[in-house]
């Protein structure tokens, strides 16, 4: 069964973007390819239990098992050695991607205190959008009473758009709340 957002994309957004951006083929219309959620846990070098808690929370909100990210280089300033676990990330595609994006736009972001919209300047020049979230408790799956420490995360939405303008138009039609 398809996600509500996926149905909206195929039936409504694709024809609108096709006309709006003057494409010659329907295959040129940009689409979301994947969403990458990254949680960096700096405390994981001293206490591995903090990494386990972050992995559990990331698994709850994404619906799939995250992979542990490891340090590429040793840094004495942070007491970090090459190969030490320092975070977790998960890559979402398909139905889980659309479900997560729907939840992010309609449930999680409106729960952020003093939320005025996500930044319009968070595009990378190649049609990808990255935003940071300061607290994981804005997601309904994360139980506030079981949270040991508030952690932020980076959410990257990778699109097939060639330019920032195309990616902005796509995300705006999907319902991403951009700041005015």
Swiss-Prot record:
InterPro entries registered for this protein in UniProt: Ribosomal_uL5, Ribosomal_uL5_bac-type, Ribosomal_uL5_C, Ribosomal_uL5_CS, Ribosomal_uL5_dom_sf, Ribosomal_uL5_N
Keyword tags: Ribonucleoprotein, Ribosomal protein, RNA-binding, rRNA-binding, tRNA-binding
GO biological process: translation
Single GO term (MF): rRNA binding
This protein's GO CC annotations: ribonucleoprotein complex; ribosome
Quaternary structure note: Part of the 50S ribosomal subunit; part of the 5S rRNA/L5/L18/L25 subcomplex. Contacts the 5S rRNA and the P site tRNA. Forms a bridge to the 30S subunit in the 70S ribosome.
Described function: This is one of the proteins that bind and probably mediate the attachment of the 5S RNA into the large ribosomal subunit, where it forms part of the central protuberance. In the 70S ribosome it contacts protein S13 of the 30S subunit (bridge B1b), connecting the 2 subunits; this bridge is implicated in subunit movement. Contacts the P site tRNA; the 5S rRNA and some of its associated proteins might help stabilize positioning of ribosome-bound tRNAs.
PANTHER family attached to this UniProt entry: 60S RIBOSOMAL PROTEIN L11-RELATED
Family listed: Belongs to the universal ribosomal protein uL5 family.
Protein name, entry field: Large ribosomal subunit protein uL5
Source species of the chain: Mycoplasma capricolum subsp. capricolum (strain California kid / ATCC 27343 / NCTC 10154)
């Amino acid at each position: 069964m398809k996600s509500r957002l996926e149905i909206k994309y195929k039936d409504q957004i694709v024809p609108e973007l096709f006309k709006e951006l003057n494409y010659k083929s329907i295959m040129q219309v940009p689409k979301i390819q994947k969403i990458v959620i990254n949680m960096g846990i700096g405390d994981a070098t001293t206490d591995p239990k903090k990494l386990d808690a972050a992995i559990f929370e990331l698994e709850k909100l994404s619906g799939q098992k995250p992979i542990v990210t490891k340090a590429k280089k040793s840094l004495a300033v942070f007491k970090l050695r090459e190969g030490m676990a320092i975070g977790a990330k998960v890559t979402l595609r398909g139905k889980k991607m659309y479900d997560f994006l729907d939840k992010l736009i309609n449930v999680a972001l409106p729960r952020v205190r003093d939320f005025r919209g996500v930044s319009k300047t968070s595009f990378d020049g190649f049609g990808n959008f990255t935003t940071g979230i300061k607290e994981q408790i804005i997601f309904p799956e994360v139980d506030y009473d079981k949270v040991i420490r508030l952690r932020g995360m980076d959410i990257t939405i990778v699109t097939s758009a060639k330019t920032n303008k195309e990616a902005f138009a796509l995300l705006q039609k999907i319902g991403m709340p951009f700041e005015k």
